[in-house]
Amino acid sequence: MAIGLIGRKVGMTRIFTEDGTSIPVTVIEIAGNRVTQVKTLETDGYRALQVTTGTKKANRITKAEAGHFAKGGVEAGRGLWEMRLADGEGEGIEVGAEINVDIFADTVKVDVTGQSKGKGFQGGVKRWNFRTQDMTHGNSLAHRSNGSIGQNQTPGRVFKGKKMSGHMGAEQVTTQNLHVVRVDAERNLLLVRGAVPGATNGDLIIKPAVKA
């Protein structure tokens, strides 16, 4: 897996090309990602980089977190994220190093992972795009009902994974192959074409596209 960065969704806007074409873009702020730990095959059984970004109030940091950050000589951030490394990736990156948005300077497309907006408890029509039942013709109570959820004595149960009403959203979602429109290293900004998962100010993981 390629090295990615942790960013924050600022919001959406649009930019214009020289010929006047309007391009909808999402602005992602990628402050310096500080390496807090480098995991190796010898010590951990796999290769990975653990990073943090941003800041966190001192009274919100646990003793375990404080010790972990102090061991790496890194300022405490708002969280910890880990990215697996393939053979040959991340060579020369040490604890305390800072990775910035300019690593995407030559990247054409990226995959963006975030937590989708939570929508609470929803029915089958909204959650799974079920078709509604008749509004009339004798139907007076079950317009948006899910309908049958199984059979009879055989199998005598509801199969796991059956699409039913329940909590919708607030889950990890990845949008693939978003075109990189602009990299602003001076202001730590990355502009990608289109929308990305999650609400404004939500954390995002940005990696070079695997299917590009």
From Swiss-Prot:
Methylated by PrmB. PROSITE patterns: RIBOSOMAL_L3 (PS00474). SUPFAM superfamilies: Translation proteins. GO terms for molecular function: rRNA binding; structural constituent of ribosome. The keyword Ion transport does not apply. InterPro entries: Ribosomal_uL3 (IPR000597), Ribosomal_uL3_bac/org-type (IPR019927), Ribosomal_uL3_CS (IPR019926), Transl_B-barrel_sf (IPR009000). Keywords: Methylation, Ribonucleoprotein, Ribosomal protein, RNA-binding, rRNA-binding. It holds the Pfam family Ribosomal_L3. Belongs to the universal ribosomal protein uL3 family. Part of the 50S ribosomal subunit. Forms a cluster with proteins L14 and L19. One of the primary rRNA binding proteins, it binds directly near the 3'-end of the 23S rRNA, where it nucleates assembly of the 50S subunit. PANTHER family: 50S RIBOSOMAL PROTEIN L3, LARGE RIBOSOMAL SUBUNIT PROTEIN UL3C. This is Large ribosomal subunit protein uL3. It comes from Shewanella frigidimarina (strain NCIMB 400).
